[in-house]
Amino acid sequence: MKQTYIVDGVRTPIGKFKGMLAAVRTDDLAAMTIAKLLEKNPELDPAAIDDVILGCANQAGEDNRNVARMAALLAGLPWSVPGETVNRLCASGMSAAIHAHRAIMVGDGDLFIAGGVENMSRGPYVISKSESAFDTGSKMYDTSFGWRFVNPKMKELYGTHAMGETAENLVEQFGISREDQDAFALWSQQKAARAQERGRFRLEKFAVEILQRKKDPIIFVEDEFMKPNTTLEALGGLRAAFKKDGSVTAGNSSGLNDGAVALLMASGEAVERHGLKPLARVVSSAVAGVEPRIMGIGPVEASKKALAKVDLTLDDMDIIELNEAFAAQVLACTRELGLVDNDERINPNGGAIALGHPLGVTGGRILHSAALELQETGKKYALVSMCIGVGQGYATILERA
């Protein structure tokens, strides 16, 4: 089997809900990110790309009908380069990268663009069609986030808990206090603020030009969801968002966000042929299913599977990127894995509580961030994992190249 390498990557700044990126079409957002990745690698012939694979969780609006293919064409790739869109909800970006990894492993290609896009601000309203003449039972849903068109049998079997409710279920099951959740959220904000101050995120992102009618374009540079000046007191004053007398709040949760990411992934042969300098090698990956009502525990089982495949343990991991859907969810996972809450390996540059969580993007973002961190620190292994709505977890192990 061939080896797979993450060679390069780039992302947009992450936009807040109805923020700076709300004016940008989802397919354009993906296209400009792909174009920037190619611009960063001028030695590559775009026609040599074997496939473009993007994750996207919504796909109800401008991201419909295979946004990866649309974005590839809009980015200027020749029509001979194909494209595929994958959907594993919160882990869509990671799934896209592992799709590329598997294709490289079995010899189906040597050069791939993988990543994801999500513009939750632009998720459309959708309405069901009438089932019969004069039927007044049509329903309308906001597709930005959450369940829609639920199968009654699904609700009967597993319930349709909102994501925040699944976090509250973990709070109850693992006895996680509000104070611990807020402390973790503050830690995420502080780490992200330090990373921003030292220019760490400049290694990941590019400035987005947002066109204005009859005005000069706006240049969007900095992640806008971050709250670097928050305090424990401010976090402690927020009301529970999902359950009366609950402890999961807007402050200790990730947000609804917009963005795009693109990774250049290559086989060892392609690295040599094109003179590329890889960041990290994909060592192992695994996906696992868990009970939907506690979907946030998914990274535990996925991580165990990914580690076992290659006879590694958590002690071998130098960096642990665990997506912060909710502070409660991260703490449930770390405690179940036997880690202390403030293990210095966890999300060294902050996570989604600070930066935001554009669903189709985050998996690709944290893979790239972990690969860069391995290079910057000279460390060997990173474990990158995330929970997934409806009860799954995904994990990938990287080794510094």
Description of each model-found segment:
Residues 86-118, 171-200, 262-269, 335, ...:
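Active-site-proximal alpha-helical scaffold in enzymes
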Residues 111-169:
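Flexible glycine-/small-residue-enriched beta->alpha junction loops
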Residues 22-112, 116-135, 205-221, 293-294, ...:
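Conserved beta-ketoacyl condensing-enzyme motif
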Residues 165-168, 204, 212-214, 283-354:
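Active-site pocket-lining segment
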Residues 64, 83-92, 252-256, 282, ...:
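Active-site nucleophile and cofactor-binding loops and adjacent substrate-binding regions
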Residues 1-26, 145, 150, 231-297, ...:
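Condensing-enzyme catalytic core mediating Claisen C-C bond formation in acyl metabolism
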Residues 11-12, 23-32, 43, 180-273, ...:
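N-terminal extracellular/periplasmic Venus flytrap/periplasmic-binding protein-like
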Residues 27-41, 67-71, 96-99, 163-170, ...:
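Short, well-ordered amphipathic alpha-helical segments that serve as non-catalytic structural scaffolds
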